[in-house]
Amino acid sequence: MNLKSASQLTLYGLNDHFNELVSLYKKKKLPNKILLSGNKGIGKCTLAYHLINFILSNDEEFPYDEKNFTINENNKSFKLTINNVNPNFNLIDVASDKKFIDISQIRNLILNLNKSSLNKKPRFVLIDNIEYLNKNSINSLLKFLEEPNDNIYFLLIHNNKRILSTLKSRCLNFKIHLTNSQSAEVLNCILKKKILNNINNELIDYYFTPGKILELINFSNDYEIELENLTLKNFLRILIEKNYYKKNIFGKALLFDLIESFLQKKEFHIQSNLFEYFITKINDVKKFNLDDEIIINEFHEKVLNE
């Protein structure tokens, strides 16, 4: 199942947000520094790609279908974008072999933007996971954002993690939110079936955005894990005891997400003084790139096997 935001032809659930941004653009009031903030997997990046295609395809063949919130796969700008050769589009994200967005990525971006444009169309910079900008990357980006940038739009994707206030203050913040019922509707549209009937409600309650559930489904299919009657606690046991979290990058991210969800359960929070301890340890592992095996084994022993 293809989960890449760039190739999602139809926008689901975020139509009102899209219309608001399009309305600002048509009135020539669209800010050139926009922060799209919300839970990871909610569709912020997909929304950004649709807005970009709407603008770039406006004077091209097979333009964006505004009525049905759909990108035409035959559109020139769409083809250039998914093949990473669109001169009017720059994507910045964490490299597969890195844990943070490196300053070299920002420097190369600035060099590219300082070059003359090949056409008169707007240019777009999409920075995903901006919470992974390191200090040097942020400082370099801030200097460029302070300068006048005619016809260049920055769309920054923020996953509700803490970011530098100086970066946040330079952008107009659009908060993206979906209710559980809206998320369920989005999933049903994408999958063409009611897949949530096959997932334990406890997992849904603690892991519920469309993108995250889709990743969870893919992961469970890869390792033949039945989710229908699986509690959150037992799922954590399986991930750790069978070392599934070591199989790929998503597996480890999934494990830490679910550990945090489990720790934030009200009954656990009240009854255990380990809550703050493990949350602090997990944050330190992520922030300082520490050995995560120690904290995972400790969590398994002190919490899951209590």
Where are the predicted features?
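Conserved alpha-helical scaffold flanking the Walker A/P-loop in AAA+ ATPase domains
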Residues: N19-Y25, N75-T81, D102-F124, Y132, ...
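Conserved Walker-type P-loop NTP-binding/catalytic site
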Residues: F78-L91
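Flexible beta-alpha connector loops of hexameric P-loop NTPases
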Residues: S96-I103, F174
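Residues immediately C-terminal
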Residues: D97, Y132, E147, R162
